[in-house]
Amino acid sequence: MKEKIITLVLLMLTSVAQAQTLEECQQAAEKNYPIIKQYGLIAQTTELTVKNIQKGWLPQITASAQATYQSDVVSWPENTQRMYQQMGLNMKGLTKDQYKIGVDLQQIIYDGGAIGSQRSIARQEGKVQEAQTEANLYQVRKRVNEMYFSLLLLNEQIRLNDDVKALLLSSEKKLAAMVKGGTAATSDFDNVKAERLSVAQQNESLKSQRQMLQRMLSVFCGIEISNPEKPAAVEASVSASNRPEIRLFNNQLKLTEVQEKALDTKLRPTLGLYAQGYYGYPGLNMFEDMMSRKWSLNGIVGIKLSWNVGALYTHKNDKAKLKAQRELIENAREVFLFNNNMEQIQQTENVSRYRTMMQGDDEIIALRTNVRKAAESKLAHGIIDVNSLLREINNENAAKTQQAIHEIDMLKEMYNLKYTNNE
């Protein structure tokens, strides 16, 4: 006997230890959902992009090699050639085949703020991607709510069916005694037993549904869900400012502002150093190369100021496009807030409706219980038949089921309102 008590206590402790709250399931589901990996990938991609942009300040080095054949080249006038020949000088002139192996180097000194703007755009794009991921991940909570409260409702229905089975079993035992005493017909006993077996069959179906839902919720959350805890009633305020979608819209608007600033950098001139060096023929000293066709080392160093006036052609249209894009984002935010407000109104009214209905549930159940007990007494005295008792048992169970549905639905609407407002 002592061992049985210890075993029972351990089972009860295990059951308590395995109880999960709605918040625990939501947190576990967010950690388990594959999309959460995108946070690290977005941060990594953004950092690499910024580093690549920053390398725009490094010297840009280009190595090249070329060989050309020209239809004509610079040559001495015939009079000059004859004069040199008379002096004993052989002026060969340039050859039509020319070769060059060289390196070009460019170093930006002032870029008009282009690199800084690109860096700001890359970081803001990363923030937009993170906000989008957060908004997508937030929807996990609603899916958890749906499965969690469906599971709670199934638990209540199974519990109520167990109560009905107990009532029917009690009536079945009483009728068995009455059949033996000759005060009840065997058909009455069979009727109650058939009803009990029917309820047991319904319970098995409900348990099968519960097992399936538990499995789905467990896989979704990444933890074993065996004993969901009924959450307490809460009151949520009417506000949508905390929703991650709002942060997404704000980051998208911020991105258009950064992009607009980047447009202005395209209108500014750039200043840079450059150097060219090559080994080939002909070199920079063309007169010497016309006399002796030898390869030589050559180099140029300078400073360059450039201004792309072509950016002026599209500047106005580019700004107009960004303005239209901002208006689209603002409109999407307005639509979201409108729909969010409609959901809040619906959920708030549903909570009020279920709360009002629950106020009458206790009285209805009390009345149905009294009627059922009276029916049991009447059956024992032969005043009513078994069908009347079964009807009252089902009526009482229906009243209790309605109360459970009203309570679970009210809690579901309360926590859906919390989801709508992100509280």
Residue ranges of model-derived segments:
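Bacterial Sec-pathway N-terminal export signals of envelope proteins
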Residues: 18-62, 66-72, 183-185, 221-259, ...
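Sec/SRP-type N-terminal targeting helices
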Residues: 37-41, 54, 109-137, 187, ...
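Bacterial Sec-dependent N-terminal signal peptides
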Residues: 1-34, 57, 410-411, 417, ...
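Short segments within alpha-helical structural elements
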Residues: 195-223, 366-423
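Periplasmic alpha-helical coiled-coil/stalk elements that build and connect Gram-negative outer-membrane
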Residues: 24, 48, 133-247, 254, ...
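Amphipathic alpha-helical coiled-coil segments and their boundaries
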Residues: 25, 32, 39, 108, ...
